[in-house]
Curated annotation (Swiss-Prot):
The presence of a 'disulfide through disulfide knot' structurally defines this protein as a knottin. It comes from Melicytus chathamicus (Chatham Island mahoe). Keywords: Disulfide bond, Knottin, Plant defense. This is a cyclic peptide. SUPFAM superfamilies: Cyclotides. This is Cyclotide mech-7. Disulfide bonds join C5-C19, C9-C21, C14-C26. There is a cross-link at G1-D29 (Cyclopeptide (Gly-Asp)). One of its GO terms (biological process) is defense response. Transmembrane segments: none annotated.
Length: 29
Protein backbone atom coordinates (compact mmCIF):
# COMPACT_ATOMS: atom_id res chain seq x y z
CA UNK A 1 0.00 0.00 0.00
CA UNK A 2 1.57 3.24 1.20
CA UNK A 3 5.38 3.55 1.32
CA UNK A 4 5.71 5.04 4.79
CA UNK A 5 8.56 2.97 6.20
CA UNK A 6 11.15 5.74 5.93
CA UNK A 7 13.87 3.17 5.47
CA UNK A 8 16.16 2.32 2.58
CA UNK A 9 17.17 -1.20 1.59
CA UNK A 10 20.16 -0.78 -0.67
CA UNK A 11 21.48 -4.10 0.67
CA UNK A 12 18.10 -5.73 0.11
CA UNK A 13 16.76 -6.03 3.65
CA UNK A 14 14.36 -4.02 5.79
CA UNK A 15 14.52 -3.82 9.58
CA UNK A 16 11.11 -2.24 10.06
CA UNK A 17 8.42 -4.84 10.92
CA UNK A 18 5.84 -5.25 8.18
CA UNK A 19 8.01 -3.60 5.54
CA UNK A 20 9.41 -5.16 2.41
CA UNK A 21 12.17 -4.07 0.08
CA UNK A 22 11.09 -2.27 -3.07
CA UNK A 23 14.63 -1.31 -4.01
CA UNK A 24 15.97 1.11 -3.01
CA UNK A 25 13.36 1.83 -0.35
CA UNK A 26 11.25 -0.16 2.10
CA UNK A 27 7.48 -0.11 1.64
CA UNK A 28 4.36 -1.47 3.28
CA UNK A 29 1.59 -3.10 1.21
Amino acid sequence: GIPICGETCTIGTCNTPGCTCSWPVCTRD
